[in-house]
Amino acid sequence: MKPVIVVHGGAGRIFKEREEGSRAGVVRAALRGYGILKQGGSALDAVEEAVRSMEDDPHFNAGCGSVLNEKGEVEMDAIIMDGKNLDSGAVSAVKNIANPIKLARLVMEKTKHMLLTDHGAHLFAQAMGIPETPGEKLITERSRERWKNNLEPDSNPQEFQKDLGTVGAVAIDREGNVACATSTGGLSNKLIGRVGDTACIGSGGYADNRSGAASTTGHGESIMKVVLARLILYHMEQGMSPEMAADTALEYMKTRVGGLGGVIVVNNSGEWAARFSTKQMSWATVKDDQLHYGIYAGERDTKPVDEALISESEGF
């Protein structure tokens, strides 16, 4: 099986001044994940590395760069899933952690549970020796400004939630195993303790070697209502291609609950899709040593991986 990785940097509205950074960020993440696959590494390792790369990138609403809750604090959710045995690990409402996706994987591999939240997740992180990151180090000036603006009496909640950020990755490795990973800071100015779709298995992501893997982004409550990631895999199990399955599921979410979002998908044959019903979604994929990436509907730039690696080392 030829390895494939697909990543997304969140569906919604990407402001012009952030386009270049967002595009470069998903390309970097895809190249890092593909590097692991190319060396014979697992899909699980590849998606974790890709998502970790975006958590460390302030252009995205995950890890450093996460939006703030109503109290001006960062609370993050993440999930990772192994399609080989349906094992999954997730964390929700976690604070002071630089890479929630790493903690989610530890939940999967070091506990009998699938989801830890808030204080319990914090205690587990301490037990696992994960260093605590001061909350201020996860807050960017952009996130702080958005939080302040959204507190204004005349602010429009629907307007500021158009900038829906989440990061994710799906992959298939040489052994034919699939995996997914998703991480987010959630909704801006959300209630303390709010948990969205990302940490919920079947909503923020799902992976099963029998069909494929999906990672979602968009309005979390809508995604949870239709269990979007699992719905996409169901459509593929009925014979749909990744692209058709993604489009069908997104259309259902839009017509049934009025929700917009985006998805990345890979099936167990290595076919992939990156689809969205929002205005934009940054995405990138590598297959057959070819990098493809874009932000707008219909946009698809392509370059050889070797050339992309040189460009990335020179600052894209």
Where are the regions a protein language model picked out?
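Alpha/propeptide regions of enzymes that mature by internal proteolysis
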Residues: 1-316
